[in-house]
Swiss-Prot record:
Pfam families listed in its UniProt record: Peptidase_M18
Keywords: Aminopeptidase, Hydrolase, Metal-binding, Metalloprotease, Protease, Zinc
Binding residue positions for Zn(2+): H82, H156, H401
Reported cofactor(s): Zn(2+)
Name of the protein this chain belongs to: Probable M18 family aminopeptidase 2
Encoding gene per record: apeB
GO CC aspect terms: cytoplasm
A GO MF term: aminopeptidase activity
Lineage, highest ranks first: Bacteria, Pseudomonadati, Pseudomonadota, Gammaproteobacteria, Pseudomonadales
EC top class, as a word: hydrolase
HAMAP family associated with the record: Aminopeptidase_M18_2 (MF_00467)
Length: 429
């Protein structure tokens, strides 16, 4: 089972270079498993025992199965994750011609580690909006092949490189696509129109706009002398999206279970498709149109916010609190912060710990050093939006927000097992 899950994650990462592709891949898998697509613009006709999903902006998705028990009396089991990851996104008018090279201007999305983006074989993917026969349409594209790179400056020309070098995102990050003659004027929109034709057989009249991201073409892999690790891009947080989906498929039929994967977590979640927007609440209110039933159900529910945790690094162990150093392959991590950067309470932490113990899943705890700041997740945002009890957890990870992150090869199975047990829990605290 462990190897099968790890390979499934690797395949999902390859199919998901952007939040749009990550959402489309989840939707395709749900559809194949018998889940029915719902349209927010149309009336919904749901029933007990039904399994459904709905997307927003092509970059966020909520999937749910409706159990046979009244929601107002038994609540919902919710798992939350996010589809976005730090990356380099193409600017609206990106064309640059410098020293005989065609480059694209990029904007840094989220808190990316920038140095690892140099000297990588990069491709480009995302969503393109275009007009065709008088209609405005959108399609996802993925060049798949290495079409760009950001070469480093040789150390002979930058002797201080190994003593620390501040990267100027405006000047130093535009990837090189091609070498061009002085009289050439490359047209990026024409390139996108050509890709639409090659990938989808479409003839676009005008490419109107796009949301495109560069990504590393090196595929994820199980690595290490004994296969102890999974290395890959976007483990934060597609690992949790994938684990939540597998757990949803493992859930028993009696409880109402929800998987919510929102966009824009890396930039604050304040959007129509982010956790700080109305997406989840609006979906739940369509399932519970009566206000009293809605309030009762929320107060009987629990959310597991799943987002990667910082594993203690052997070369930088002093960056962790001495008593709270999560280890790879030692199970999911309960994340705690007194200043509510995480939404965990003693009650929700105790429930999750008990769930792990009952299902023989190892569990760990994380709190930041008292002299360091702490990141956050969708947990506090969703808890404050809905008033739902929440526990923040995640799998331990190295190199978070790098172009290539590292997690333990045993931990995915641990997470799927405990999330599946949560979805099937007859009683919540």
């Amino acid at each position: 089972m462990r190897d099968e899950l790890n390979q499934g994650l690797i395949d999902y990462l390859k199919a998901s270079p952007t939040p749009f592709h990550a959402t489309a891949s989840l939707a395709q898998t749900l559809q194949a498993a018998g889940y029915k697509a719902l349209d927010e613009r149309e009336p919904w006709h749901t029933e007990a025992g039904g399994r459904y999903y709905v997307t927003r902006n092509d970059s966020a998705i909520i999937a749910f199965q409706l159990g046979g028990k009244p929601l107002a009396e038994h609540g919902l089991r919710l798992v939350g994750a996010h589809t976005d990851s730090p990356c380099l996104r193409v600017k609206p008018q990106p064309e640059l011609q410098r020293q005989g090279f065609w480059q694209l201007g990029v904007e840094v999305y989220g808190g990316a580690l920038l140095a690892p983006w140099f000297d990588r074989d990069l491709s480009l993917a995302g969503r393109v909006t275009y007009s065709r026969d008088g209609r405005i349409e959108s399609q996802l594209i993925d060049f798949r092949q290495p079409i760009a790179c950001i070469p480093n400056l040789a150390i002979h020309l930058n002797r201080e490189a190994n003593q620390g070098w501040a990267i100027n995102a405006q000047n130093e990050l535009p990837p090189i696509l091609a070498q061009i003659a002085s009289q050439e004027s490359p047209d990026f929109r024409a390139l996108l129109a050509d890709q639409l034709g090659r990938e989808h057989g479409l003839v676009a009249d005008v490419v109107l706009d796009f949301e495109l991201s560069f990504y590393d073409t090196q595929p994820a892999a199980v690595i290490g002398l004994n296969g102890d690790f999974i290395a890959g891009a976007r483990l934060d947080n597609l690992l949790s999206c994938f684990a939540g989906l597998q757990a949803l498929f493992d859930a028993g039929p009696d409880e109402t279970c929800v998987l919510v994967c929102t966009d824009h977590e890396e930039v604050g979640s304040a959007s129509m498709c982010g956790a700080d927007g109305p997406f989840l609440e609006q979906v739940l209110r369509r399932l519970l149109p009566e206000e009293d039933d809605f309030q009762r159900a929320i107060n009987r529910s629990l959310l597991i916010s799943a987002d990667n945790a910082h594993a203690v690094h052997p070369n930088y162990a002093d960056k962790h609190d001495g008593n709270h150093g999560p280890k790879l392959n030692a199970g999911p991590v309960i994340k705690v912060n007194s200043n509510q950067r995480y939404a965990t309470s003693s009650e929700t932490a105790g429930f999750f710990r008990h769930l792990c113990l009952e299902n023989e899943v190892p569990v760990q705890s994380f709190v930041t050093r008292s002299d360091m700041g702490c990141g956050s997740t969708i947990g506090p945002i969703t808890a404050s939006q809905l008033g739902v009890r929440t526990v923040d957890i995640g799998l331990p990870t190295f190199a978070m927000h790098s172009i290539r992150e590292l997690a333990g090869s045993q931990d995915l199975a641990h997470l799927v097992k405990v999330l599946g047990a949560f979805y099937s829990s007859a009683e919540l605290p």
